[in-house]
Design a protein with these regions (language model features):
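Histidine-rich, glycine-flanked metal-binding segment
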Residues: 1-4, 10-62, 77, 506
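Divalent metal-coordination and catalytic microenvironments
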Residues: 8, 28, 56, 67, ...
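Acidic, glycine-enriched loop/beta-strand segments at the rims
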Residues: 11-22, 407-413, 418-419, 460-469, ...
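Divalent metal-dependent hydrolysis catalytic cores, especially in the metallo-beta-lactamase
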Residues: 83-102, 106-129, 158-173, 200-213, ...
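Active-site neighborhoods of metal-dependent hydrolases
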Residues: 139-143, 151-184, 190-211, 256-259, ...
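Structured alpha-helical segments in the cores of large, soluble enzyme domains
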Residues: 189-202, 218-231, 247-260
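C-terminal cap of metal-dependent C-N hydrolases
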Residues: 334, 421-427, 432-433, 448, ...
Length: 549
């Protein structure tokens, strides 16, 4: 055997009681678990094996981030401590219906501009990513060999990654960016693309139903695509049509749609936001309980913070986004069109802003792609507008034009009681929704998992520690259909994290969002240390995790 983790408090990912044990690792897998209660001598030190004294530390499966935006970060940054230092050993990317495969050349260029605020990688970016893939299989292969020959210990990526087929990208490549129903031939073409992507290893399909162009798909189109996903045993992960005024209706739509399709459902960042939803999480959970009791297969993820994070352009009404990024900029430059957008945003409530009239004092600029605009970062749109002596919409419009739709934002619209109620639920998992771009990203990107463990489990007692760990490990592994991950069990892959239950905490704050966590001294992927004594090693043990893997 290669490694002995001695005298650890094992929290195995099932939600059951923890226990003290020696855990051995050999050839990248857990080879033995000797519980203290078993009696007899402790596990001897084998010749050549390393022994880590884990007394006082909890040993858990590596954490699974069910909602990540590291699609390019994994290719750009071999260190990727934003996730590795949290104990994350697997991320699910391809989220919110927009990512970089499957694509043709034209669609790739459009998608790069559309989500530069999430991931960087805009059309003019020179950040070391060469975009030399077009299919999902080619993208996953690229992850597997991202840093070969670059002098690291391993040539893959920092942590493992699973991929969802992005429905909006599929629609962009087949239908375009127009607001119209797909023809029968177009629907068939989209079904083929989704099927091919699942055959190449995608674990399911995502949608962004407040983002262009995925938002233009009707229920019939989405149901047809979900039937394809169901045939392959995948799941549908929608960012649904409203988290505000129409939130419950939007959740009902997703439950009904996947029920008709016979498809498993995973609700992305399942929140109830804005003033209209304060204290309404129990209504959502009652809806889900009824569906679960009737036999539906549903899970969800959340992050343990009240503010949200997205792009400023996502706030616009859907008609303003028709035609894609170039058409959006044309409308913003046209005074009459811009005034129509302002009226819907401020006085009616745009679907992009979840049907709620926008409150500019809750919209904080967290990042821009143009350094000349950096003075706006960390200020609300209302504050920037006041400094310039202009109306908030004037400031927002100018930022969108000058930064070519690039600004990212924090939305201060959540409610603590809703966050706590949803994280207690039996189908809850953890997902950071971590956007790594911008000068002041949301701290969830660097802090979600230690924040669950330190603040919500230990300090507030919202969840017992063993149950909290299950939400972050065993439960998401089951949703992904992973047979040998997510549990501390003999034969499982040694994707493991050792943390101090007494000190683990997120270091990231809204003021210093890139500060790394404390209390997580060791993280292993395939039995190899990616975090050792609290520091990132040069090990790149991560690979793509494909459907059925």
């Amino acid at each position: 055997m290669d490694l002995v983790l001695r005298d650890a408090r094992v929290i195995d990912g099932t939600g059951g009681a923890s226990y003290r044990a020696d855990v051995t690792v050999e050839a990248g897998r857990i080879s033995g678990i000797r519980r203290e209660s078993d009696g007899g001598p402790r596990t001897p030190r084998p010749t050549g094996a390393r022994v880590v004294d884990a007394a006082g530390l909890a040993l858990a499966p590596g954490f699974i981030d069910m909602h990540a935006h590291s699609d390019l970060a994994l290719l750009r940054d071999p260190d990727h401590s934003a996730k590795a230092a949290q104990g994350v050993t697997l991320e699910v990317i391809g989220q919110d219906g927009l990512s970089y495969a499957p694509v043709d050349d034209a669609t790739l260029a459009q998608v790069r501009q559309a989500i530069a605020g999430w991931n960087g990688g805009g059309p003019d970016a020179d950040d070391g990513v060469d975009f030399d893939w077009r299919t999902v299989g080619e993208y996953l292969d690229r992850l597997d060999h991202a840093f070969e020959g670059r002098g690291f210990d391993g040539g893959g990526i920092a942590v493992n990654a699973a991929y969802l087929v992005p429905q909006g990208t599929v629609r962009a490549g087949v239908v375009g960016w127009d607001d119209r129903p797909a023809t029968e031939a177009e629907r068939a073409a989209m079904e083929r693309l989704v099927a091919e992507s699942l055959e190449q290893g995608a674990v399911g399909m995502s949608s962004g139903l407040t983002y262009t162009p995925g938002m233009y798909a009707d229920d019939a189109e989405l149901t047809a695509l979900c039937r394809v996903v169901a045939r392959y045993g995948g799941y549908y992960c929608p960012h649904h049509r409203s988290y505000g005024a129409g939130a419950l209706r939007a959740y009902e739509e997703m439950v009904a749609l996947t029920g008709r399709a016979g498809c498993a459902l995973h609700l992305a960042h399942a929140t109830m936001n804005f003033g209209v939803n304060k204290g309404k999480a129990p209504e959502l959970l009652a809806l889900l309980d009824r569906a679960l009791d009737a036999g539906a297969d549903i899970t969800l993820d959340t992050y343990p913070y009240t503010p949200g994070c997205t792009t400023l352009v996502a706030m616009l009404p859907s008609w303003a986004s028709e035609g894609g990024p170039g058409a959006i900029l044309e409308r913003l430059r046209d005074d009459a069109s811009a005034e129509r957008i302002r009226y819907v945003l401020e006085e009616v409530g745009a679907d992009g802003c979840h049907g709620v009239p926008i409150e500019w004092d809750t919209i904080e600029i967290s990042g821009v792609t143009d350094p000349a605009l950096a003075g706006h970062v960390g200020r609300t749109v209302a504050e920037s507008a006041a400094s310039a002596g202009e109306a908030p919409w004037t400031t927002a419009r100018r930022l969108l034009i000058e930064d070519r739709l690039g600004p990212t934002i924090l939305q201060h619209v959540g409610h603590e009681e809703n966050v706590r109620a949803i994280m207690r639920h039996r189908i809850h998992t953890g997902g950071s929704d971590g956007i790594l771009q911008g000068a002041k990203p949301h701290p969830r990107a660097y802090g979600t998992f230690p924040h669950y463990l330190g603040r919500y489990a230990r300090d507030l007692g919202v969840l017992p520690l063993e149950e909290c760990v299950a939400h972050l490990t065993g439960r998401p592994a089951a949703r992904l259909g992973l047979r040998d991950r997510g549990l501390v069990r003999v034969g499982h892959r040694a994707d493991l994290v050792l943390f101090d239950p007494d000190t683990v905490a997120a270091g990231s704050t809204f003021e210093a969002p890139r500060t790394l966590p404390v209390g997580i001294p060791y993280v292993l992927i395939d039995g190899r240390f990616v975090i050792e004594d609290g520091r990132r090693t040069d090990v790149l043990a991560g690979r793509s995790v494909r459907r059925g893997g």
